[in-house]
Amino acid sequence: MKLNENVKIVAEKCVLVPYEPCHVEKYHKWMEDEEIRRLTGSERLSLEEEFEMQKSWREDDDKLTFIVLSREEGEETNRMLGDVNLFISKSENLEEEEDVGEVEVMIAEPRGRGKGIGQEAVSLIISWAFKNLQIARFCVKITEDNAPSLSLFEKKLGFKRVSYSSAFKEITMELPGERLESHFGRFLGENSQILEHK
């Protein structure tokens, strides 16, 4: 998260800010929900473990984590809706040297669902990584029974299915290069503003 530690992105429907210690307690409450853990493939952690996880993410060079906030005024922790993450790794194809960004998004607060906020948050993190980190390949792994996420990535964002793991009951999708250039390549400047996060 060192990569985005001072980045704040303000867009039409949401604001993205780095995951800070002040966010951990609310994040931990979300992760106490068994359904959220199931859909995100997360383990239950104690509050202390959650603080340690936030600290480790903060120091990692291969993770981008933003907390998704509503655009309304008020205390930041009261505006929290979810998070959006990007895990950066080398391509599994030995002939390719490029980095791949694996995207994850969670809109934990019911008041933030069904409004296009998840779609905007994913578009913002992909656009930011494309422009600032030169990542040109993006993928997502979604459990087969997570219909909202499958719809978001496939129908709304244009990801294409590339594989299925029967062991994990998980579908892997990738974002086609032409979609990245045509939509995400220009999304950030047109629909948002990047500020310094303090």
From Swiss-Prot:
Belongs to the acetyltransferase family. GNAT subfamily. Keywords: Acyltransferase, Transferase. The lineage of its organism: Eukaryota, Metazoa, Ecdysozoa, Nematoda, Chromadorea. The keyword Transferase applies. Residues 34-178 form the N-acetyltransferase domain. It is an enzyme of class 2 (transferase). Disulfide bonds: none annotated. GO terms for molecular function: N-acetyltransferase activity. It holds the Pfam family Acetyltransf_3. The keyword Membrane does not apply. This is N-acetyltransferase 9-like protein. It comes from the Eukaryota. Its EC number is 2.3.1.-.
